[in-house]
Amino acid sequence: MKLNSFEEVKRLTQEMVAIPSINKEPKGETAVAKYVYDYYMGLDYFKEHPERVKMFQTKNDFVERHSTYAYVKGTKGDSGRTVILIGHLDTVGVDDFGTIRE
């Protein structure tokens, strides 16, 4: 399981930054977490192992943010190695940027 090219990474980046994700917007950062979840679920590995992808709501968070994580279990021998895919999603308001905020 790997990204196939620079172009795919570029496409993913462009799609993610195009998502309105400021927390005061409807759904805020959750929309990005959902995008990541859907992306993972579209990969062949996770189609075969959908239980290894989760989207969860952050506890005690008045903005009701979400995060996504996934994990890939190793297949060589009985090493038991696992790769965990998780990242921090955070956005900030753009009001301070005035005319260049868009």
Tell me the role of every PLM-derived stretch.
Residues 2-102:
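Acidic/His- and Gly-rich active-site-bordering loop/insert found
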